[in-house]
Amino acid sequence: QNALIEALVDSKQKDSFLLGMWALNRDNPYHSYLKVVDAEKLDNKSYHPGGCTPLYDKWVETLSANVTYAQQLRDSGTTVRSIAVVITDGQDYGSRQHTAADCATLAKDLLDSETFVLAMVGLGNHGFKDVAKDMGIPAGAVLEAGDTPSDVRRVFQLVSQSVIRASQAKVNPKSAQNNFFTP
């Protein structure tokens, strides 16, 4: 996560990025949308991996918050493109309000709007590609990675490159769904 923030801060487009950060195993976000230079970097005190992840509930909650904020920006005349990337082991533990089908319905609506890019990174080997498909995330926007520290660093570097490329309009939102992680 820190590598992602650093890459965005170092990009020429840093002033055009807002970053919201949620952990799927927490009730509250680390922070809502801030300029990337103000985004919180994680350390051993602020981030505690593990615990139960209500993946479907948190994905819908996070996307709903993004939709609301993006609409506020649009209403004020700001052009907005939203890129949401979930990094997960693909397991849902404890979702009580939403199912994978609910996620897929929301994903379809957002992708059809052509103002959203949705992507998933799966860490480890837990069948997350099927989960991503069930949640409506296009196959070209799904990345499989190991779960070692070097794998995780590589993933954040690739995510940051993909976000920067998408923000520079080198790919349009529709095609980004099919090749988000392709350089």
What is the predicted function of each stretch?
Residues 1-183:
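Acidic, low-complexity intrinsically disordered regions
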